[in-house]
Amino acid sequence: LTTLIPPKVASASNLGSNPAAKRMQHIVSFYSKLPRGEASFPKAKSPLGLYREKYFDTGSGAPLLHASLFFLAVGYGLEYYFHLSHHKEH
């Protein structure tokens, strides 16, 4: 008969007690060891981390404005450079 029953079910320690209660006790002991309260996050030190903390974590729309201004400035710079190179050729 013991060859048909898996070893975990047929163990002597589980025969006299409720296995569900033992499993629940393991879960309770695991969760009781976890820290409680607010999680503390390390402060950002890099410029990108500070930017993310200031604008992205607060849900601000400023990064969209910053990105559009950046692309506008880069586009203007490229147009100006290639316009000057066009004048050198002619």
From Swiss-Prot:
A single Gene Ontology molecular function, please?
proton-transporting ATP synthase activity, rotational mechanism
Q: Pfam families from the entry? A: F1F0-ATPsyn_F (PF10791)
Keywords for the protein's UniProt record, in alphabetical order: ATP synthesis, CF(0), Hydrogen ion transport, Ion transport, Membrane, Mitochondrion, Mitochondrion inner membrane, Transport
Q: Where, subcellularly, is it found?
A: Mitochondrion inner membrane
- Domain of life (superkingdom): Eukaryota
Q: GO terms for CC?
A: mitochondrial inner membrane; proton-transporting ATP synthase complex
Q: Which residues form a coiled coil?
A: none
Task of the protein: Mitochondrial membrane ATP synthase (F(1)F(0) ATP synthase or Complex V) produces ATP from ADP in the presence of a proton gradient across the membrane which is generated by electron transport complexes of the respiratory chain. F-type ATP synthases consist of two structural domains, F(1) - containing the extramembraneous catalytic core, and F(0) - containing the membrane proton channel, linked together by a central stalk and a peripheral stalk.
Assembly description: F-type ATP synthases have 2 components, the catalytic core F(1) and the membrane-embedded component F(0), linked together by a central stalk and a peripheral stalk. The central stalk, also called rotor shaft, is often seen as part of F(1). The peripheral stalk is seen as part of F(0). F(0) contains the membrane channel next to the rotor. F-type ATP synthases form dimers but each monomer functions independently in ATP generation.
Family, per the entry? Belongs to the ATPase F chain family.
Protein name per its UniProtKB record? ATP synthase subunit f, mitochondrial
Taxonomic source organism: Pichia angusta
